[in-house]
């Protein structure tokens, strides 16, 4: 059968044209017929033109790889035609000449394709050459697991806070509302830059960075510069004065008092007033030391109880001499000295944990021995790794199980907050990544069902918060605490407080008591036997590496004085400034007037000096949210972290702040304990907490792991006791005084006053959006109840170990305890309200307040008050005024009493005549009165 020839395609023509470039014209003429026949046979075997294009491109690349400058040379046909062909006289081209011209034309069309092909070939060759070169950042992977890459990522991003089981529903984001309001907001004046200030205060501080001044209390006569007057061991004094005893602070004057105030008090008060003031200060110092500071002086009975309860440190007692102690410390300069297993050492090396910290050196060998531990160290000293490393090491030697039913949950780690539990979970997973140890995270805010599924597999380590753990113990099938061998409590002093007391007792009762090891860790750990005895500890070992309640060595503590004025408040009205509608005479110089100045001082710091990587601690969730709105309206990127947010929002806020997406993190004390957020440079305390432990945990978010850090605290008149305690517990080089120019603070007050309507509008719109979401949720809930009623009611009811009233009472007790830590004045006497004032000023202030209260009562009653009542109040005021002490040297004014004089005259006449009392009775009878 005759095969029909197909017409040559365009690809075949391009191939022929490419072939013609590599052969001479003579050879092409000689082999014209065979070549055409061969091409015809080749064309008959093709299926499509697309394959021909790919093959042609590869063929052209192979033929022209040797000629590097073929693209820049002129066309070969133009050079060969004059030598090997002759043009007829009539100017007509021959058949072969026309073919060569057509081929040259086709080559011109495909020149771009050939250029790209040759260029890609050249680039690929260059890439191969670059790949063979040695990278300057090349590192040998010793273990072959890519651990160096993992460490680089961990160093850049910190601990991984991502968790599973979150509810990815649409969230209410106030940032969208703020951005919408900000677009229509008029342009606000820019804050005064530090470089452009021309005030006299800044001219004196040009040699100091960031307006930082040493607290030179005794050398400064200016009231604006004087901060902590009377304290002799503050920075700026001589070296000998720096080494004075810290106990001298208790006998000195108020740190916030000034020379001018002291002089006026000396002029106005008498000796009795001075004695009363000194007695009052002494009583307040005694109360402060008893309520806020653990007494260093222990009675013999307390020492005996602690000696009987605690066991001796075996490492400390084994070092009989200083040389042996030194050799022991040298031997424990690396984790290899603890005889840890290879997977644990491998993980520590990948995390760049080479040398153990002091708390780790003392804790790991004792924990490996299975002893109970009560440990304390400063913030950022590696306490989490101190209990996680020995725990994982002990689990590596456990008996291997063949089936999941034989697995046991052996370790329970408790944390007071969800974020701290998530961080412990991340640290544990990183240290145990080369082992087969399984972890389970049980915290509130995440899916209960996913946690139940993980607990059914009986993971070796369970990290939980107390509330969710009790929920799983009572309501999750096949999960118990009967096999717990190691119980760890992070931030144990918080777990021992009243808010967690009932839950902690329930957990301890569920855990076995026989061979259980218990370890307690905290930066402010207590050694009170009465609190620790309920945890069923067995001769625990006390490991307090650092002095009690001290800050990190590289932490600089700055204090900004807050002065009260007669202003009426700033943005946010009641919530933000803390001011209600009060007369100026009442709020002038008072506590609420100080609260009105705090937002302006805070924004002055955040817009001028600390512009990134700054954590700001406030005392309430409402204040944190309102400050976030103010920051957003001013164009400052800020996140918030408190209990009113969902768990997804809390994790997102932490992650954004850690990754640098937000510059500020406004948080309550929810984030003050245990969190290790990478890159925190500054911590700002919007107000001073009422207890020193809370202050230590707040400022401990910076200056961690030997890094530098700075803590700035806004201090008012009522915070002087906490200020004195902070000065006493810190070294001289750590305390500094920061002065914010009054012009900057006044400018920021004006800005906040302009923002007040916008803040109210954002809050109002957010409230409306929240109401709509609640309505939608209730509607969806009703639909689910109607469509899936049988399934919903068939679910078993979840139980709790407390009744509803007991749970409410425990919640109220926890809230009261937190408020007591935030404001020590709530439980103090009434005289603390006028602390720091002389007797004359105190009485004047009391009188002004009484007058204002009477004025309010008079206006509120609207004339209903009787005249007798008004006269009674006037009489009370007159009596109080008469009892006020007078100045020395002024004799009291004696007024003649006419009635008393007449009576004395009548009595004198009878006595002169020798009469008696009977005569006076007759005189009365003669006067007309009836005798009885």
Curated annotation (Swiss-Prot):
Protein name: ATP-dependent RNA helicase DRS1
Similarity comment: family membership: Belongs to the DEAD box helicase family. DDX27/DRS1 subfamily.
SMART domains recorded: DEXDc, HELICc
Entry EC no(s): 3.6.4.13
Claim: Nucleotide-binding is one of the keywords in the record: yes
GO molecular function: ATP binding; ATP hydrolysis activity; RNA binding; RNA helicase activity
Gene designation: DRS1
Organism, as annotated: Mycosarcoma maydis
Residue numbers covered by motif DEAD box: 490-493
Lineage, highest ranks first: Eukaryota, Fungi, Dikarya, Basidiomycota, Ustilaginomycotina
Free-text note on domains in this protein's UniProt record: The Q motif is unique to and characteristic of the DEAD box family of RNA helicases and controls ATP binding and hydrolysis.
